[in-house]
């Protein structure tokens, strides 16, 4: 879980899907839910819950100068550039993602759904596992 930077309950991170990360997600699947967010949800997450990592301290992303100072060498100068890099999984995705602090989300409004069972995967009416595009509804409830 620490390799995925998921150290607390209801934390969220972006991950580039590769063979190694898929294997890591398989190992922690009973404890996490994942899917493919839309650009609007990525933008909403960064604007509402986004914090940057500057000198190992958690800084809110209130000004583009914070991003330009940390990621200017990679061509990322504003919040929109950061969102674009995360959404497109560009060449500087790793640096942009490591700059972002893991998102601290709230517990979902109205719970995880009626009749959702903790010990079953999402495909079988549970909570954890791959939600694919339905992750967007959960993100909207947790922002």
Predicted regions located by residue number:
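Core subunits and conserved enzymes of cellular information-processing
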Residues: 2-143
């Amino acid at each position: 879980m620490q390799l995925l930077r998921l150290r607390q309950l209801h934390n969220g991170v972006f991950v580039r899907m590769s063979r190694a990360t898929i294997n890591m997600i398989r190992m922690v699947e009973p404890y996490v839910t994942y899917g493919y967010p839309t650009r609007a949800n990525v933008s909403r997450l960064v604007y509402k819950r986004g914090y940057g990592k500057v000198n190992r301290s958690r800084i809110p992303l209130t000004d583009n100068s914070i991003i330009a100072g940390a990621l200017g060498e990679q061509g990322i100068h504003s919040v929109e550039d950061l969102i674009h890099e995360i959404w497109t999984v560009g060449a500087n995705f790793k640096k942009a993602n490591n700059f972002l602090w893991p998102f601290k989300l709230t517990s979902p409004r109205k719970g995880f759904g009626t009749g959702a069972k903790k010990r079953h995967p999402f495909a079988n009416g549970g909570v954890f596992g791959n939600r694919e595009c339905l992750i967007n509804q959960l993100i909207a409830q947790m922002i």
